[in-house]
Structures are given as structure tokens and as C-alpha cells.
Amino acid sequence: MLKVELLKKQIFGEVAACVYVIEFQKWGFQHAHLLLILKSGSKLLNPELYDRIVCAEIPNPEKNRHLCSLVIKHMIHGPCGDKNKQSPCMRGGRCKNNYPKNFSPYTGHGEDSYACYRKRDDGQKIRVRKHELDNQWVIPYNPYLLALFDCHINLEIWSTFMRV
């Protein structure tokens, strides 16, 4: 069904190529990595376009309670670091995924090939496993896909081919 959304409905634009691999995690659940290469006319060339597709913030629960609950359920990293030094993502006293991320008032290009998503310091906090967390802990997601599939779907935009 995800392939239908991406390849047939082309929710992110016309697709030139799609490559994916399905892995099985330690506990037997399927886990997919999928790379979409968009055609020239559909490429996301600036941070304003990134923000139309990817979000890395907690939705306002008064405006969209359902989406907020899905983000809390599926798209919060950890907690790790000082909040949980025993988290599986910890390597040498640091999170291997670099959480918590820095606050940022806008989306921009990162030093590597990933975008740095808007994570505003808006004072909004949520409670997850006895910890108060904010936008620094939100994994990038697409609101439409998160609501449609009700599961963890980490969505990242690469601005170069350095990682491929």
C-alpha cells in the first residue's frame, strides 16, 4: 500500500526510480529502507518545499489531537542520553542518532546530505515514559503517511548523493 501512495498516486511527485530493501529486525519485525529519486520537475530543491512534505515537530493537540497522538505513539526517539543512559541507541555515552536534535526555527541544508528540519522551541512538551520531551525528540515524518498507516515511517530528504 505504501508503494501505491508513492509510485501510483505519486504523493511526493513523479518518481524516476525506486529502490528498497526489506530487513528483519532482531525481534522478527519487517523493516524497510526505501529510496525515491524524483524526476527533474518534481525534485525538492529548497527548504520551503521540504516543509510541505516533512515535519519534525509535535502537532498542536488542540488543532489535531489525532495526529499529535500518532506522533507521540510512533515518532518520538528514545528518550536516551541523560534521560536514559541504557537506551539501545547509546554508543560511548552518546546517541548514535544524535538525539536530542538542536532546536531550529527553520528548515535548512545540513553539513551532510540530510536536511536539518524545523524544530521550533515553542514550549510545547509531551510526556513519554515518565519524561517530558519537546520537538528535539521528534523523528521526521510525513503527516499524511503517519495518519494513513498508523506506524513509524521516518521520512528524510537528501539534498545530494553523498549518502547513496
Predicted segment positions?
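Extended, structured polyanion-binding interfaces
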Residues: 1-164
